[in-house]
């Protein structure tokens, strides 16, 4: 639900998934998100930002005038900016040279009680500038949370947002609720979190190293009598209940997506809840070890095989339009950031090893357009540059750019899904097989090469990927158009002799 916050800034609606390293088949840490917008046509570019590109620059947001002087020492990082920087950069997601991954943001809203005493700051930090001012300047996930928290403390926040961080050791989810208050939680190694446009972190343990939080947040809640929890003595501090919302809009637009994530990743937990339960768990254990494709399937879901699928045949007209699905025509891109889990080193040691090229490259699996119709492409983040064909997308439809080819797959597929479903499914299956083989082949080739040659192995691998994935997309689009032409209702049975 893209919406305007109290500050008047445009909000984007997204769905996020975070997976700890003991919950994946290969020990990877995964943070993932769909980037949605108010329109199906808000093109994205994929690029590698060189080290130091904005060092010492005064950054001024095109969205709300937020202004900050950036420090020196910025690292190289990957980014997915909008093609209209004058309206805000919106770099959204990436991995830097120290192998810190960040995805920003998961839009949310705080309730009126807390905003009354700590309102949004009109020209404070918002989604459009968040990745740009944090990711190049941190070397661990915890440093990412810390730097973002310090910026919010100094400049204020223009909106409520959730932010995902990961490194080789851990994943963190940070929720900025009000103008200056926030909480972050480390995702337990054997757990998963699914978030959908609501403040979601539950009980906060202020004595645990698994939580970080804004200075004075407990005093703020106590001073303004904001905690409604029952019980004598020290009452539980449930961040979701104190700062979050639970409205009819949430139960139609947000909560059902979390339930759908549970349905796909922990079905036995989903069975214990209704689609609109307000007490769905923030973190949970999946019913199996997960891979990138499992997380991608969750982000590609449109309530498949349920009565709530808007392009399905189960249920009725009412049920199919009742709840918002995870994947939308308005999804601009979907990403799964994969970082190899490392044991026996500290986060700081991992950062130093990453900067020397000694660790396996993180992978950004990205689907341009709507992920249930577009393939996830494994782009290696240790490449010095990404394929130029993915950069500088045209602001209006242009099939000469990959973004618009992938965007067209959704436009050609979902309106007459009964006609395109089989071909689209076969295409996605074929692309997954090719992508998984490609990622493994490049990964093994790079690790077998001398450290100083690995970056070039990754860059060549990305270039080869771009060639076949774009070519395959063009062929698939042509096949879809032919199928739709043959199935057109604007026809009539003809005499074969004419």
Mark where each language-model region is.
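Histidine-centered catalytic/metal-binding microenvironments
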Residues: 428-498
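A contiguous strand-loop segment
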Residues: 3-127, 147-271, 278-280
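Extended, Lys/Arg-enriched charged tracts that mediate electrostatic binding to polyanionic substrates
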Residues: 145, 151-154, 306-308, 316
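Substrate-recognition/cap regions that form aromatic- and gly/pro-loop-enriched pockets
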Residues: 308-451
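Short Pro/Gly-enriched beta-strand edge/turn motifs at strand-loop
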Residues: 1-3, 72-76, 145, 312-321
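Glycine-rich, aromatic-lined ligand/substrate-binding cores of catalytic
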Residues: 223-350
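Short, well-ordered beta-strand elements within core beta-sheets of diverse protein domains
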Residues: 131-137
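Short, charged, surface-exposed loops that flank catalytic or proteolytic processing sites
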Residues: 137-143
